[in-house]
Swiss-Prot record:
Gene name per UniProt: HUB1
Name assigned to this protein: Ubiquitin-like modifier HUB1
Protein biosynthesis recorded as keyword: no
GO molecular-function terms, A-Z: protein tag activity
GO cellular component, one term: nucleus
Ranges of residues in domain Ubiquitin-like: 1-73
InterPro entries: Hub1/Ubl5, Ubiquitin-like_dom, Ubiquitin-like_domsf
Function: Forms conjugate with SPH1 and HBT1. Involved in morphogenesis.
Domain of life: Eukaryota
CDD domains: Ubl_UBL5
One GO-annotated biological process of the protein: positive regulation of RNA splicing
UniProt keyword list: Ubl conjugation pathway
Amino acid sequence: MIEVVVNDRLGKKVRVKCLAEDSVGDFKKVLSLQIGTQPNKIVLQKGGSVLKDHISLEDYEVHDQTNLELYYL
């Protein structure tokens, strides 16, 4: 189990617990429940690269306490 920190760049930080093997799409579903937004309205970035829904967090080298940027569509 890892904890990922998601920052929406408007001052809101959300900590989400998940598994490293989870896909980005599954992670967005968990995140959307915490922030009250639909998963298809969320874009996640790490280091300026947009994360694709079908790839796992582990493949993007997202580890415990990794920071991701959150953008709304």
